[in-house]
Amino acid sequence: YLYPNSGQASSIADALRLEVQRLARQHLIKEAYNTEVLAVEKQGRVFKVRTEGWTCESEAVILACGSEAGPKTGSTGDGYRFARELGHQVIRPLPALTGVYAREADRGTLAGVRMDARVTLWIDEELCIAEEGEVQFASYGLSGIPVFQVSRYVSRALEKGRTCRIDLDVCPAYTAEELEAVFVKRGERMKDRKGTEILIGMFPEKLSQVLLGRAGISLKKSRRDWTARDCRRLAGQI
């Protein structure tokens, strides 16, 4: 998927709307809002767009009906019907550019946390795709642009009964070995610090708690009592 430099998909809709308004002012096209399209027909080289009150004829038609993601806004799936009636083959609509539900028990704990990360999708234990960017942890699972980018692959795989797994690397700029070295160096200066205090500045506190818990390191354990294995397990969780 491609985004404009603004990072907002709505910019595309705004650009199209402004161009339509410009052409309408020049009387080159007819502009109509809140008008339900009943049918799109092709007769020879001419397309006819029928509404309740009038019919528009043109040499080309763009079907941009918004799928069926928002019926309240008019996105009722009519575009699929129009496409079929015009002879197009329509594949089954599935969610895309969306968040992903996760089974992890601590997903609620991380709700609201944002973090740059690498998102790697595995389907039936085979690498499918990896994306980097800001990941947003939600009560249901994961969101954010890199998650949106992989979501369409998740939808197709689940439809076919395949197994999906997403790995998150919340510190993609470092290898596990480099992270171990960071923890060792911090240990020289932070011997009396405990728990999330040791990871201050590296990760949000909520995420630090989860990472330490998964590594089996007690939040009450001082850095001086960490073992080399603790550092290795924590680096692996990150």
Feature roles, as predicted:
Residues 33, 209-237:
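A glycine-rich dinucleotide-binding beta-alpha-beta segment and adjacent secondary-structure elements
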